């Protein structure tokens, strides 16, 4: 039996059944096809595509999303593409409202690199629908954002529900650390004004049964550690034990900032006192989610998480620093590796830092710690 679900918001009745129908029909018939086309565009963030301007993929992604936005039947909607010399483009939209407040909605259009490890039949630039999941690079991070934002606004306007003055931005450098965003925001400052709230559609949710709010995210320090020991590769049977191993020295340097046995960051300046309110919230979230805190990740059989306490796992991923090696150069593949003592080891470091840590001073400290007095005079 069909039931008409209703609610009241600011004195206006809401037909939830009608709203749900609009969302589902729009998502299935309009958003999924357009989002699938967006997935096909290899719009790598500038950090991963130094020739992004010449390649034109970011431009294509921005144009694609902007074109869809312009077609939406939203009263008062304006859509424009903002450009600054040498910077990635940004979509700026406005929807005037009936409430004398401003809300800023944020999303981004650039993507992470392709990576490897896709399951058979799946790939980064080929959208594949399997059940209720759409696979492909950038669909969830963060291509869906503009689609979701404007569909939500349509739902409000369809039922005459008052809303604030809405300003929307879709940037294209987020996966590189948003280096272009500050200049765009400065250029748009007078038009954006002072938002009463910022909605950032680039996060996650614990489950589908609750409304989740992201209170803070960790920042990231990204850099490369390059250890050089020789000007040419030499036979390890001849030089091994004489020329120091660049990999060993890299490990030694990393031990200055991280305990290799536990993974704990050993630089005090990268830690903060966690507010008691956040600890309490982590405990509540752990009770709600249970093992889903870690079981949502693709662990191999027999591999265990870093802690058996679910609350501690939540705090680990939100309020504590962590180091990961996300790339490496100077190493041949295992199949191509011979008996050569390599000239260098180059590692890309990704260091997550919690809210409250000064990123500039932390970056300087990490660089100094890793590079001062390298073992055996390595370069």
Show which residues each predicted segment covers:
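Metal-dependent amide/peptide-bond hydrolase catalytic core
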Residues: 11-16, 26, 206-208, 222-379
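N-terminal helical capping/dimerization or prosegment-like subdomains
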Residues: 11-116, 344, 348, 361
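Short, conserved micro-motifs enriched in small and acidic residues
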Residues: 34, 134-147, 175, 240, ...
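Active-site metal-coordination/substrate-binding segment of hydrolases
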Residues: 100-170, 193
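Short glycine/proline-enriched loop/turn "hinge" motifs that connect secondary-structure elements
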Residues: 119-120, 160-161, 214-220, 317, ...
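Active-site-proximal alpha-helical scaffold in enzymes
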Residues: 143-159, 178-186, 244-256
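Histidine/acidic-residue-rich, glycine-tolerant segments that coordinate divalent metal ions
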Residues: 163-244
């Amino acid at each position: 039996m069909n039931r008409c679900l209703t609610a009241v918001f600011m004195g206006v009745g809401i037909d939830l059944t009608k709203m749900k129908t609009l969302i589902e029909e729009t998502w299935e018939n309009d958003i999924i096809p357009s989002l699938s086309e967006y997935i096909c565009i290899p719009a790598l963030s500038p950090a991963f595509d130094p020739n992004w301007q010449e390649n034109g993929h970011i431009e294509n992604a921005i144009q694609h999303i902007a074109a869809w936005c312009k077609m939406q039947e939203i009263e008062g909607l304006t859509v424009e593409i903002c450009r600054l010399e040498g910077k990635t483009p940004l979509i700026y939209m406005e929807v005037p409202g009936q409430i004398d407040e401003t809300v800023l909605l944020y999303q981004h259009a650039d993507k992470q690199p392709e990576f490897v490890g896709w399951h058979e039949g799946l790939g980064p630039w080929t959208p594949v629908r399997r059940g209720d999941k759409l696979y492909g690079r950038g669909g969830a991070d963060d291509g869906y954002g503009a689609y979701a934002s404007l569909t939500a606004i349509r739902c409000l306007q369809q039922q005459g529900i008052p809303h604030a003055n809405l300003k929307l931005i879709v940037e294209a450098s987020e996966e590189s650390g948003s280096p272009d965003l500050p200049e765009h925001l400065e250029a748009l400052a007078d038009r954006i004004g002072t938002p009463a709230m910022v909605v950032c559609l680039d996060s996650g949710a614990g489950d589908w049964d609750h409304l989740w709010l992201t209170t803070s995210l960790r920042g990231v320090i990204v850099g490369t550690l390059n250890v050089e020991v020789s000007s040419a590769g030499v036979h390890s049977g001849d030089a091994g034990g004489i020329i120091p191993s660049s990999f060993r020295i890299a490990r030694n340097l990393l031990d200055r900032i991280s305990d290799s046995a536990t993974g704990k960051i050993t630089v005090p300046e990268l830690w903060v006192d966690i507010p008691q309110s956040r600890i309490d919230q982590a405990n509540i979230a752990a009770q709600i989610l249970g093992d889903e805190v870690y079981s949502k990740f693709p662990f191999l059989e027999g591999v265990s998480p870093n802690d058996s306490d679910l609350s501690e796992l939540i705090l680990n991923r939100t309020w504590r620093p962590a180091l990961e090696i996300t790339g490496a150069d100077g190493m041949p593949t295992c199949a191509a590796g011979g008996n050569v003592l390599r000239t260098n080891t180059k590692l890309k470091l990704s260091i997550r830092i919690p809210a409250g840590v000064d990123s500039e001073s932390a970056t300087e400290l990490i660089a100094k710690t890793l590079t001062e007095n390298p073992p055996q005079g390595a370069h």
